[in-house]
């Protein structure tokens, strides 16, 4: 299982939100490039970037910071937040991002997602963000009537090979992942699942690895020191062996 540090960017700074609430924001660093370099130096094999301003605006906002990060590190970077048009996806990939995460468009524009999957294959990752089992969109400000499990099946049928599942109520709360919801998404021949939200301890990392997810995105727990990256990577590796 891969451990993926998260870097959430707002106004060019590295921040964390509590349950996606912009009013409950903590700034962890003014320079996200330095943060990215630090995670790489500590052994990270991939970084998870979120353009929070982009998620709310519906199109990318922190382009300069994202480009600076992709130029500063040698490890692959995946990006989410406001990527809802084909040209935005193209632009993100041109910045040096390896994977692009499609969230809102997965519900709003199925034809677009099908086209993107056809064009870019594994470079497209579906982001399913759920609140009480229902998919949330538009920077988590809108909760749909679509079940996360239903959307996951639809995306798999379109050819999606990878899904990032975020439980919004757990995100930034250090309350533990939603293991039950994750287990519902893992199928023998379905898309690989990456877990995001709520990881607060090494035990959570071990449980996720045992559950069979491909990766675990960790944000707040790394920034507050509740989880050490090297230890998490070691546990994830040992559990997989």
Swiss-Prot record:
Q: Which GO terms describe its biological process?
A: L-histidine biosynthetic process; L-tryptophan biosynthetic process
- Compartment list: Cytoplasm
Catalytic function, reaction form: 1-(5-phospho-beta-D-ribosyl)-5-[(5-phospho-beta-D-ribosylamino)methylideneamino]imidazole-4-carboxamide = 5-[(5-phospho-1-deoxy-D-ribulos-1-ylimino)methylamino]-1-(5-phospho-beta-D-ribosyl)imidazole-4-carboxamide
Gene Ontology CC terms: cytoplasm
User: What is the superkingdom listed in this entry's lineage?
Assistant: Bacteria
Q: What is its EC number?
A: 5.3.1.16
Q: In which pathway does it act?
A: Amino-acid biosynthesis; L-histidine biosynthesis; L-histidine from 5-phospho-alpha-D-ribose 1-diphosphate: step 4/9
Report the principal subcellular site. cytoplasm
What Pfam families would the database entry show? His_biosynth (PF00977)
**Active site, UniProt feature:** 8 (proton acceptor), 129 (proton donor)
Q: Name one GO molecular function term.
A: 1-(5-phosphoribosyl)-5-[(5-phosphoribosylamino)methylideneamino]imidazole-4-carboxamide isomerase activity
Q: Which UniProt keywords apply?
A: Amino-acid biosynthesis, Cytoplasm, Histidine biosynthesis, Isomerase
**PANTHER family noted in UniProt:** 1-(5-PHOSPHORIBOSYL)-5-[(5-PHOSPHORIBOSYLAMINO)METHYLIDENEAMINO] IMIDAZOLE-4-CARBOXAMIDE ISOMERASE
Q: Which family does it belong to?
A: Belongs to the HisA/HisF family.
- Please give the NCBIfam families that the UniProt record associates with this protein: 1-(5-phosphoribosyl)-5-[(5-phosphoribosylamino)methylideneamino]imidazole-4-carboxamide isomerase
State what protein this is by name.
1-(5-phosphoribosyl)-5-[(5-phosphoribosylamino)methylideneamino] imidazole-4-carboxamide isomerase
The organism is Chloroflexus aurantiacus (strain ATCC 29364 / DSM 637 / Y-400-fl)
Gene for this protein?
Answer: hisA
């Amino acid at each position: 299982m891969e451990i993926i540090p998260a870097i959430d960017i707002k106004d060019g700074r590295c921040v964390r939100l509590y349950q996606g609430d912009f009013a409950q924001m903590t700034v962890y660093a003014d320079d996200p490039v330095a943060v990215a370099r630090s995670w790489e130096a500590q052994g990270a094999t991939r970084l998870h970037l979120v353009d929070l301003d982009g998620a709310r605006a519906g199109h990318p906002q922190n382009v300069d910071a994202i480009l600076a990060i992709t130029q500063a590190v040698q490890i692959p970077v995946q990006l989410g937040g406001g990527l809802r048009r084909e040209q935005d996806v193209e632009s993100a990939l041109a910045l040096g991002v390896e994977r692009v995460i499609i969230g809102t468009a997965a519900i709003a524009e199925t034809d677009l997602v099908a086209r993107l999957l056809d064009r870019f294959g594994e470079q497209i990752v579906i982001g399913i963000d759920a609140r009480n089992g229902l998919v949330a969109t538009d920077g988590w400000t809108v909760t749909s009537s679509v079940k996360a499990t239903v959307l996951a099946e639809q995306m798999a049928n379109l050819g999606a090979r990878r899904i990032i599942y975020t439980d919004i109520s757990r995100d930034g709360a250090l309350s533990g992942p939603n293991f039950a919801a994750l287990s519902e998404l893992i199928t023998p021949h379905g898309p690989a699942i990456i877990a995001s939200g709520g990881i607060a301890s090494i035990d959570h990392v071990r449980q996720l690895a045992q559950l069979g997810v491909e990766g675990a995105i960790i944000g707040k727990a790394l920034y507050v020191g509740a989880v050490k990256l090297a230890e998490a990577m070691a546990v994830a590796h040992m559990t997989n062996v």
